[in-house]
């Protein structure tokens, strides 16, 4: 979908956070969102710094009245990135998944019903499409495997009943030029009669090479050694006027680092080497003090 095909009107960022999605909207449309909502004061402060011209609400998204917030102006685009942690598989079998947080996406249908945005976009983890009822005792609520996706389908139908055409798709950020391989679910709903189109991958086999995180890192920045003791990390923070890095790193983290060095440096025919732009910061080579 080409955002420039959308009619003129307000743009709204629910769950605005520090402003990452809002900056993306600004790059796509040429202007910052008109309205941004988040319950966290610190997040809104950061958002204000990035988007000072936006009208900000420090509030639970359900307590902001869409009609009052928009003051009768038409809404061209509503963006929503609800809390994903209580849907994500990264949470594993963690107890007590929060029913209220899993239900945050229902605020989208509230806005759709009251102010009829021409286009609605939602981004979340891919498990959002499995959104369904929770089962189990209080304190250990887990998604019901037999009713997987039931609530998501109800949510989609509610938008369709309000006159929206709804489509969803998994997109991998790396295939579109971002230096991360994360896959996210994107839902697009529109009621303006224009078609929903999806971006074509630009990076990958046969296309442009994937971008790497290394391209975004300033290797000349001083960094505390991963092998530092807590005392060494504290001294490093004081010397460089930085927060004290957490040391020692967890054993599993060190094991992942070791696997990465083996895969991308030691056993790689084209090893990844930073070069002389990075400062030397490794005082020893063992995983713990006393190892060499």
Protein language model features and the residues they cover:
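SAM cofactor-binding core of SAM-dependent methyltransferases
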Residues: 12-63
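Conserved alpha-helix/loop element of class I SAM-dependent methyltransferases that forms part
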Residues: 1-5
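A generic, residue-level signal for flexible/boundary positions that often mark functional hotspots
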Residues: 31-33, 55-58, 81, 165, ...
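Extreme N-terminal starter segment of soluble prokaryotic enzymes
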Residues: 7-10
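Class I S-adenosyl-L-methionine
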Residues: 66-77, 84-291
């Amino acid at each position: 979908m080409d955002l420039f095909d959308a009619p003129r009107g307000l743009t709204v960022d629910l769950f605005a956070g520090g402003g990452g999605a809002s900056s993306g909207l600004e790059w796509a449309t040429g202007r910052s969102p008109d309205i941004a909502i988040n319950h966290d004061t610190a997040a809104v402060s950061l958002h204000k710094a990035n988007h000072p011209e936006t009208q900000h609400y420090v509030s639970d998204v359900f307590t902001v009245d869409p009609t009052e917030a928009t003051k009768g102006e038409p809404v061209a685009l509503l963006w929503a990135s609800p809390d994903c942690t209580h849907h994500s598989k990264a949470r594993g079998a963690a107890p007590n998944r929060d029913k209220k947080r899993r239900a945050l996406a229902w605020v989208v249908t509230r806005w759709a019903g009251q102010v009829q945005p021409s286009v609605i976009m939602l981004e979340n983890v891919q498990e959002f499409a499995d959104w369904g009822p929770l089962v189990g005792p209080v304190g250990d609520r887990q998604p019901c495997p037999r009713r997987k996706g039931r609530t998501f389908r109800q949510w989609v139908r509610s938008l369709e009943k309000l006159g929206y055409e709804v489509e969803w798709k998994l997109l991998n950020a790396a295939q579109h030029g971002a230096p991360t391989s994360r896959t996210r679910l994107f839902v697009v709903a529109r009621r303006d009669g224009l078609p929903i189109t999806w971006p074509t991958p630009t990076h990958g086999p046969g296309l442009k090479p994937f971008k790497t995180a290394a391209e975004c890192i300033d290797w000349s920045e001083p960094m505390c050694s991963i092998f530092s003791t807590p005392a060494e990390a504290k001294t490093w923070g004081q010397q460089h006027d930085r927060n004290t890095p957490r040391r020692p790193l967890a054993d599993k983290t060190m094991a992942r680092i070791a696997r990465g060095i083996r895969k991308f440096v030691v056993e790689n025919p084209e090893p990844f080497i930073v070069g002389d732009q990075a400062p030397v910061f490794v005082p020893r080579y063992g995983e713990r003090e006393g190892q060499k």
